[in-house]
Amino acid sequence: MLLAPGDVIKRSSEELKQRQIQINLVDWAESEGGKEDKTEPKEESKAEGSKDGEGTQSESGQKEEGGKETKDADVDRRIHTAVGSGSSTKGLGERANENADRGDGKVGGGGGDADAGVGATGTNGRRWVVLTEEIARAIESKYGTKIDVYRDEVPAQIIEVERSLQKELGISREGVAEQTERLRDLRRKEKNGTHAKAVERGGRKQRKKTHGDAQREGVEEEKTSEEPARIGITIEGVMSQKKLLSMIGGVERKMAPIGARESAVMLVSNSIKDVMRATAYFTAPTGDPHWKEVAREASKKKNILAYTSTGGDAKTEFLHLIDHL
């Protein structure tokens, strides 16, 4: 039996059901007016409810509980769809498409549609790259597509993995910080004019075309449109898995869920009543106000296995632990 924070269990409820693992979740509700939190047991299975000796809730209590669950589910959805900073396409040395929608797969500068065949190669025949080794490994592991890491080469087309996709890929806090630092370095170079000459050359060519004949104008226009794209750097922020796959190719590798018979875990709980029979506990940053007390009591028990989140997505780490216990 495994103890874990209530919000981690709640986020993982669907995957736990697929694994045929029972859930005993003690929910919590914050009362208005600064009153003390009140705790109500939520019984995920009749068998566990009877074991813990918890009584059947009244009809009004069930309605309140249902409303709380709906609210929590809405909050969860908002968290998972949160937009990180710098959510639009950024151009270094070339102008990005200002009207590009975040999810349509269009790449600024080249005008290409990723869904229409840009794939892993991107616009102008160049391949997409990422900013850290951890992100490259996560993409290859999840989608089976090998992607290179940016090595300060110019030109380049860079994928910035944003907040919601970071969680989907299970990127650690250290990995997120490393990507942020590399982005800052690139923007610092842009500010210092590292790529300014490339843009300036393109601008001069564009002005010349007004004085040439029609044939020369066409040639100059073609060269001008290609010059910034060839010399500059494009950074494309990506929030969704769908857009990422349209850019790099590949498909998500879906592993068959591990059933209860293949996992040592039969029950997960955040109830302090289950501490005595728990064999392991998993702790992570949580909004469960009662988890601190549960974890403290569990740590006093002899011969109990303790696991702690490494700073990545708590749900991903929790399910990984269950599958390997």
Curated annotation (Swiss-Prot):
Keyword annotations: ATP-binding, Capsid protein, Hydrolase, Inner capsid protein, Nucleotide-binding, Virion
Q: Where does ATP bind?
A: 106
Note whether Ribonucleoprotein occurs among the keywords. Answer: no
Compositional bias segments (type: Basic and acidic residues): 8-18, 32-54, 61-79, 92-105, 185-203, 211-229
| Catalytic activity entry | ATP + H2O = ADP + phosphate + H(+)
Q: What is its EC number?
A: 3.6.4.13
Q: Name one GO molecular function term.
A: ATP binding
Renumbered residue ranges of the record's region Disordered: 1-122, 185-230
Query: What top-level class of enzyme does the UniProt entry assign?
Result: hydrolase
Gly residues bias located where? 106-122
**Briefly, what is this protein's role?**
ATP dependent RNA helicase essential for RNA packaging and viral transcription. Possesses ss- and dsRNA-binding capacity.
Instruction: Please state which protein family the record places this protein in.
Output: Belongs to the orbivirus VP6 family.
Q: How does it assemble?
A: Homohexamer.
UniProt name for this protein: Helicase VP6-A
Q: Which organism is it from?
A: Bluetongue virus 17 (isolate USA)
User: What gene codes for this chain?
Assistant: Segment-9
